[in-house]
From Swiss-Prot:
Organism of this sequence: Nitratidesulfovibrio vulgaris (strain ATCC 29579 / DSM 644 / CCUG 34227 / NCIMB 8303 / VKM B-1760 / Hildenborough) (Desulfovibrio vulgaris)
Coiled-coil region(s): none
Location of the B5 domain: 402-478
Protein name: Phenylalanine--tRNA ligase beta subunit
Gene that specifies this protein: pheT
Compartments reported by the entry: Cytoplasm
EC number: 6.1.1.20
Predominant cellular place of this UniProt entry's protein: cytoplasm
Amino acid sequence: MLLSLKWLREFVPFEGTAAELGDRLTMLGLELEEIIRPFDAIEPIVVGHVVSRERHPEADKLSVCKVDVGQGEPLDIVCGAPNVAAGQRVPVALVGTTMPGGMVIKKAKLRGQPSHGMICSERELGLGEDHDGIMVLPESFRIGARLVDELDLDREVCDIAITPNRADCLSVLGLAREVALAFGLPLTMPALDLKEEGADASNALRIDIPDASLCPLFHGRVLEGAAVRKSPAWMRYRLIAVGVRPISNIVDVTNYILMELGQPLHAYDLDLLAGGRIEVSAAREGERLTTLDGVERVLTSNDLLIRDGEKPVGLAGVMGGAETEISDKSSRVFLEAAVFRPGTIRKTARRLGLSSEASYRFERGVDQVVCTYAMNRAAQLIAGLSGATLRPGICHNEPLPWQAPVLRFRRARGEALLGISLDETFCRETLERLGCKVDAADAADWKVTAPSHRRDFEREADLIEEVARVRGMDTIEPVLPKVMRPLDRAGAPESKYSFWLRLKHWAAGLGLNEAINYSFVGQKDLDHLNLAVDGRIPIMNPLTADQNVLRTELAPGLLQNLRHNIAQGNAGLRLFEVAHIFEADATSDTTARERARLDILVYGSRYDSQWPHVEADADYADIKGIVEHCLAFLHLEGATFTLAASHPFLMPCVDVAVQGRQVGVIGRVRPEIADAYHARKDAWLADLDLDVLRELHDAARIAFRSLPVYPPVRRDITVAAPGSLQVGAVLDHILGLRLPLLCGVELIDVFEPEGKDERNLTFRMTFRHASRTLKDAEVDKERDKVAHSLVEKLPVRI
């Protein structure tokens, strides 16, 4: 937002410098990005007086002028402008001056006549587009004075970065409120003095709004007898200073009010509006409108359109239509002021790539209460600058009047959030200076009515933040956080985020690196993983086409991380992410459901290349071991791993269950999918349901068990099994025998002979007695029971 200090001082009596203003606003959260001096390039230009003008003896179109610039003898200047005449006050660039376009003025001879400077046009000075002749100045301008002083131009402009939640600051008025707040200054609004004449015009146009949510307010005023011409210099130069191109007095007023009050306006040629009505409604699919830039736009049902009785006349909140624009022939004007739904305007502007100063403000929300004041101020200016007659009455429709939210404010809550003591008087005065109405009938729980321009006031924390902002965030001393847990909460289940944090520490301690990805992904990312279309939640106003839906799995983000790391030359990757996934759920109050997930991705070299090791890549055993370690960390025993029939993007895929409840899956990313992410080796992924794991963890009871005193005895057994037999089936069978001395079984080796559809599986069994040392004979007897049972019950041989 470009803020002219001269313009600002019409609202608040601020006498400081631009730097002082920027420093204070920055501390209030409105960062000063740059101080611009828009007319620095014409600082050397002086006011001259044309003493005489003679025709050039060698060129009919040139004049030889003697120009007094207040430096003694008049200067000889050759000028080619047809409108130069003796007695004029004119802008003069002296020898040595660098013009805005980069040209340096030098002594020269033009057709034999010496010239010691240049008499300038508006375009040469960057003060307009007029280049038909020189710029003629008022006779009151002092000879030899600097042009910028005599024109009283806006010399300093602050470029203020406005955060998306502070739409109220996208105007001189909005920033003036902040300056008044920061420096304790009074705020003065421009006075209204409406001179209305003629018959009532409130019924000149009927305003129809079928859907109030799309347009809460639409009204306008009628002006007749307007003369469309160039705006006065003060308005043109002020608009130029803040980056707006002057067009004509009518259009310039609408832009002036937009920058001054933050309310976009639009002026129609009333004679070109047909049918005596205006309708604001959704466009029909495929409907067309030629906008002011001359481009024909094809509209969708998501666009908001303004129509007269016969045709579209404007793309609401974005740009007006070419058919009803103000031209030199216009004399009757309909001045529109309205409020539109921000999301609708944002979507249309993004889709069409048509961002304007108006749409930028409508997207963020405008002040519905100030809308009428802005329209009346614009009408007053148009009447004064064009000679128009303002008709009494307003064409008005407000189907959804503004309802000011009433929020609670508890000083004790503010002190708890900020960690500081808050003075009651300071809090009340701050809220009132912000424009709030404070009902302090309950001293501990105030009722605060938010002002219409602060659409970001939605909850108590917003008011507390404002109090802290005005007090000064830099005055709040940092303190170490205190974590207090009452004794009556001892043993209670930990919070979801505490559970997440413990898992993150576990994963980091295991050597995994945390990934944090956007919740937004592209439809094509989910399609690529063969994920179901049903249940996806689209984003209404996506930042990009690649982020137009909420993720239904964490895998897309991790696979993108994989692609990036491979591109950076990382040979081995160990990633994890703890986050939510989202699915549509018609039974939910919000029509959506969030689920917590822990995903782990391993890829490439098993060991760090800096350590001596046998070269090997991560495989199923690695990802399974990590999952088993996680379950052990959560004190969850008895996990089963069962081959899944199918999975959208994992093959093979194994279901992981604990106590009969599925807690996730592990498997290899399908090669064709991994290849699309530039993976040249197997990528293994685990997807665990944290909601289920947390429930199981909270229900788990840890019992004390003394450490074993007597040594274990181990026996290995190798079975030849068909390739279709799962290892889990063998393990489950051995453990299912419930041998009293058997305390553990693990797979230690797999051998697959060439040309045979079988594999040799070697298991290591651990035996132990709690109160004595085992003898070999009794251990061998237990092993024989296992061997006999395996041969009898399973298709294996020892």
